[in-house]
Design a protein with these regions (language model features):
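Short hydrophobic alpha-helices and adjacent helix-cap/hinge residues
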Residues: 1-265
Length: 265
């Protein structure tokens, strides 16, 4: 199960256009060109580069283009979430009029860095639960954006995996423990696994170097299927790990697997 890539790109394009209707001039430096910061927790490759381009396209369609009447400052943490606070602070020093945070960790870093600059987030699992907004209908504060309610979707994905492979009773959840949603995702999925009569082993990975040990652990635990939690680092990680470490005992390509994003397949 996954979101359609084209629709997701079209949505980010529309979001960029909507952001462009905000009164940039009032928040920009007096007499200067407004600066928009884009804060990424992922690397500038694949779907993330596509979505960044879609955001720029939306701005362009609304009449704002880089170098003419808008400056775009982009920062990529390349999966190293501990770099995000410094990157957010750097954007603030650039006097950005707005920060677009395309993942939960980047939105968390932006939120911690400022209470005044508007922050627009996307692909946030549960912005209310993690304290980004007061409610979905009345966000309050300086953050707004969209949610895909991933914390609620997760148990349904596990149920679908169970229906697709009913013989698999021991499953692995690959999750990034540094993601702000990690605890709530783990608890919800453990509860769902219990209701389904499944064993769900939580396996952590937050860096490239964690991936092979994670899959080795999944093999040692005799897991029969894999669920990948939604996370900017993990989105391309299983695929790249398969390419680089085909001799790993547990290979994602040989196990049934599910994720919210097709990019892990």
């Amino acid at each position: 199960m996954h979101f359609d890539r084209l629709r997701r790109r079209e949505f980010i394009t529309l979001l960029g256009g909507a952001v462009a209707t905000w009164p940039f001039a009032a928040r920009a430096q007096s007499g200067g060109v407004p600066v928009v910061g884009i804060l990424h927790s992922a690397s500038p490759t694949g779907v993330w580069l596509t979505l960044s381009g879609a955001f720029r396209q939306g701005l362009s369609q609304a009449g704002y283009s880089q170098g003419r009447n808008l400056t775009i400052e982009e920062r990529w943490a390349e999966g190293q979430y501990d770099r995000l606070p410094a990157m957010a602070a750097d954007l603030i020093r650039r006097d950005v009029a707005l920060i677009a945070a395309l993942t939960t960790p980047s939105a968390q870093a932006a939120k911690s860095a400022t209470t005044k600059i508007p922050i627009v987030f996307t692909t946030i699992a549960d912005p209310v639960q993690i304290g980004f907004v007061s409610s979905l209908s009345r966000p309050g504060g300086n953050l707004t954006g969209v949610t895909y309610l991933g914390v609620e979707v997760g148990p349904k994905l596990l149920e679908l995996l169970h229906e697709a492979v009913p013989s698999a009773k021991i499953m692995a959840l690959l999750i990034n423990p540094t993601n702000p949603n990690a605890d709530s995702q783990s608890k919800n999925l453990q509860a769902a696994a219990g209701r389904l009569g499944l064993q769900l082993h939580i396996i952590n990975a937050s860096t490239e170097g964690d991936l092979v040990p994670a899959f080795v652990k999944a093999h040692e635990l005799q897991t029969q299927a894999l669920m990948v939690a939604f996370d900017a680092f993990l989105t391309p990680a299983p695929r790249s790990s398969r390419r680089s470490h085909s001799d790993t005992p547990f290979r994602p390509s040989t196990r049934p697997a599910i994720s919210l994003r097709r990019e892990v397949s």
